[in-house]
């Protein structure tokens, strides 16, 4: 829990700067590249004998090599992350950043797990449900899980709505077992 609070604070700080500079998309994209780079070279970036500025300079060189760049405020953000040895929470910072950005646009992030690819009509029904429930437009992050058999699991605003066949089977099984115990 502590790391998620830390990640949320860093994400909020970066988003505030990005909004002020009108660079929310750019910062999100660069942060995603930095997270990928960190995950691929984790051993190097977690080496305590290398200073924070050198870590950030290496990231800067890599970003420049792929044809992108970032400004001084983003560089300062990364330097603080590495000075405080918080680089291990970069993936969580990215996730919080994405979600906070969506919320700042008066939308709601929704994690959707389905048994198969949804049709436009099915997606519209789910969109309408989420709008009715949250009073905001959803932004879906979808993943396929065939173990659901059919149906969907919707996660938003800290709540989970399980409308999957696997979820219903679990509920029926639980109720049957509870009756046997009594």
UniProtKB/Swiss-Prot annotation:
Transmembrane segments: none annotated. It comes from the Bacteria. SUPFAM superfamilies: N-terminal domain of the delta subunit of the F1F0-ATP synthase. One of its GO terms (cellular component) is proton-transporting ATP synthase complex. GO terms for molecular function: proton-transporting ATP synthase activity, rotational mechanism. InterPro entries: ATP_synth_OSCP/delta_N_sf, ATPase_OSCP/dsu. Belongs to the ATPase delta chain family. This is ATP synthase subunit delta. It comes from Pseudothermotoga lettingae (strain ATCC BAA-301 / DSM 14385 / NBRC 107922 / TMO). The gene is atpH.
């Amino acid at each position: 829990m502590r790391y998620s609070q830390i990640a949320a604070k860093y994400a909020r700080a970066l988003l505030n700067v990005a909004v002020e500079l009108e660079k929310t998309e750019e910062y999100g994209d660069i942060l995603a590249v930095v997270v990928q780079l960190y995950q691929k070279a984790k051993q190097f970036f977690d080496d305590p004998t290398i200073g924070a500025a050198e870590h950030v300079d290496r990231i800067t060189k890599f970003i420049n090599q792929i044809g992108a760049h970032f400004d001084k405020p983003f560089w300062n953000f990364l330097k603080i992350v590495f000075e405080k040895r918080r680089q291990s929470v970069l993936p969580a910072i990215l996730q919080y950043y994405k979600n906070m950005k969506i919320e700042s646009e008066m939308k709601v992030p929704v994690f959707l797990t389905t048994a198969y690819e949804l049709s436009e009509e099915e997606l519209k029904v789910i969109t309408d449900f989420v709008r009715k429930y949250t009073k905001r437009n959803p932004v879906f992050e979808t993943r396929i899980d065939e173990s659901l058999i059919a149906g969907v699991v919707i996660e938003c605003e800290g709540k989970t709505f399980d409308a999957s066949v696997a979820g219903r089977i679990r509920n029926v099984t639980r109720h049957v077992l509870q009756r046997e115990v009594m």
